[in-house]
Amino acid sequence: MQYVLGRENFAGRTFHVESGVLIPRPETEMLVQWIEEDYNTPICGLLPPAPLQILDIGTGSGCIAITLALDILNSSVAAWDISGDALLIARDNALRLGAKVNFQLQDALSIEATDRCWDIIVSNPPYICEKECEAMAENVLQHEPHTALFVPNDDPLRFYTAIAKLGKKTLTKGGTLYFETNPLYIKEVKTMLKDLGYTMIQLRKDQYDKQRFVKATLL
């Protein structure tokens, strides 16, 4: 229905959606809320901090990046996606909603060297194993982009590992990584992050009481 209407609500705003991007989910709103809880603090007018550097990897419709750009005070937001079509939709949403986001065409699995540093890296990457597709709704399989949904059965953490390794190189001291995950593999994600040297790893449940979100800090 959302593709027919061409829109979906997310965090109090209406986003344009087409078949080239995932439909924003309520679960992902909870991920954004977690970040805002942690970082949306009042700014002292006498000593304004440097803008909070935020990177959203796999932005799709731009719902995460745009919401953070509009809601978090004094932030500078960049967003990557492998799909040029998705970036066109995301840019349109940002323009319509009045958000300043730097969108870039980038593959999370083959990230080029970057000298940028980030305070926050957030991602809701593909995390559904191919073997799980039989249990999924037919309308999802027919209309939503498979590249944004599925990972190989033998490598379910491929995006999480690549992004966590990027974070090791580009997160500022005390910088934080936020993931939406497949509840079936969230313990493996936690172990991977610990093995890479992340600390203060926290898990959070979604509205269905499933462990879905991970937060980890690089000290």
Predicted regions span which residues?
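S-adenosylmethionine
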Residues: D71, S75-S76, W80-L218
